[in-house]
A protein has these predicted regions:
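Aromatic-acidic/polar surface patches that form glycan- and anion
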Residues: 88, 169, 184, 208, ...
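N-terminal juxtadomain amphipathic helix
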Residues: 3-68
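Short, flexible hinge/linker loops that cap or flank conserved catalytic cores
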Residues: 4, 101-102, 125, 278-280
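Class I SAM-dependent methyltransferase Rossmann-like catalytic core
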Residues: 58-100
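Short gly/ser/thr-rich secondary-structure transition/capping motifs
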Residues: 90, 142-143, 267-270
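General small-molecule cofactor/ligand-binding pocket signal
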Residues: 39, 46, 132, 144, ...
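Conserved SAM-binding loop
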Residues: 97-202, 211-216, 288
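S-adenosyl-L-methionine-dependent methyltransferase catalytic module, highlighting the catalytic core
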Residues: 174-175, 179, 189-310
Length: 310
């Protein structure tokens, strides 16, 4: 496991910590955290500036005290999804490429790693000693708890960042991407997956959707290595069928059963030309490299590869 203590900073004043008696103390006397030990949830330090956070410290601690049960349910839900949806063909291909191309001496950051993302299990096994992972809730899969809008790392700390199915759940995606840019070394790599044609999931903590062009715009400070859909029109239809029957019968159980009946729809993605899947895909991936110069608005418009022409 990587020793990440040398790259950690206070989330409030952005200065380094001093380690005292197995705790981390901010010694900046102008900081709101001055001489205040970081709180812990079980064995995980919490690097959050609660003066600039979406929920109060009290509510946050209450949420995390009960989050294990919530996350077990989410894990069960993901297990069911793995049966119905299988693994995205594109995700599997992308992860294989990442494994084959990644240097085993580089630092890897996983943003939102409380649950190991689809297709990432093998990646974790291959690069376990290189990965630093955090999320907003307690999980055995993470090294600590932090806010992706305000990452507790020094500039230029990582060689590679993975953020999978997270950006739709943050309040300010552009801010999170700017933080990724900040903590990545020059020419560092990013791999992101975000949904497009998916209904609301995780209730009040679901905020955004991105087209492929919108995803590209979000990462306009990065050179595009590869981009595309991770689930096509068939997968999008499968999502809609679940929510249609859930609403029609006021029953999530019936919605899940409908997915079991129509699981085969996801294989139709393979029969549909890419340009149509881009216009109605379930989600998109972006693999890129950090660059100093932003791409222009015209380049974002020209990036479109869907079926519609003007």
């Amino acid at each position: 496991m990587i020793d990440f203590n040398d790259i950690l900073i206070c989330p409030s004043c952005r200065l380094s910590f001093e380690k005292i008696n197995n705790s981390k103390i901010c010694n900046n006397n102008a900081c709101s955290n001055f001489k205040t030990p970081l709180i812990k949830i079980k064995d995980k330090f919490v690097f959050i500036d609660f003066s600039n956070f979406m929920i109060s410290k009290t509510n946050f601690l209450e949420f995390n005290s009960s989050s294990n049960n919530v996350r077990k349910n989410l894990f069960f839900s993901k297990f069911i999804k793995s049966i119905i949806y299988g693994k995205s063909f594109k995700t599997q291909s992308n992860i294989r490429r990442l494994i084959n191309n990644n240097d085993r001496n580089k630092k890897i950051l996983v943003v939102g790693g409380g649950t190991i993302g689809a297709g990432l299990s093998k990646f974790y096994k291959e690069f376990k000693k290189q990965i630093i992972s955090f999320d907003i809730y307690y999980s055995e899969n993470i090294d600590f708890i932090a806010d992706a809008h305000n990452m507790p790392f020094k500039d230029l700390s990582f060689d590679f960042v993975i953020i999978q199915a997270v950006l739709e759940h943050v309040m300010y995606p552009n801010k999170v991407v700017s933080e990724i840019y900040r903590v990545l070394k020059n020419d560092g790599l990013i791999y992101s997956e975000t949904p497009f044609m998916q209904q609301v999931h995780e209730g009040p903590y679901d905020f955004s959707r991105f087209t492929e062009s919108g995803h590209r715009l979000l990462f306009n400070n990065f050179e595009c290595i590869k981009s595309g859909f991770i689930g096509g029109l068939g997968t999008s239809l499968l999502w809609s069928i679940e929510y249609f029957f859930t609403g029609l019968f006021r029953s999530r159980k019936i919605g899940k059963i409908s997915k079991l009946i129509f699981f085969w729809l996801r294989f139709i993605d393979l029969l549909i030309p890419n340009k149509y899947n881009i216009d109605g895909g379930c989600g998109f991936f972006f693999s890129g490299r950090k660059k100093i110069k932003k791409i222009s608005d015209l380049e974002v418009v020209d990036f479109y590869n869907g079926s519609q022409t003007f």
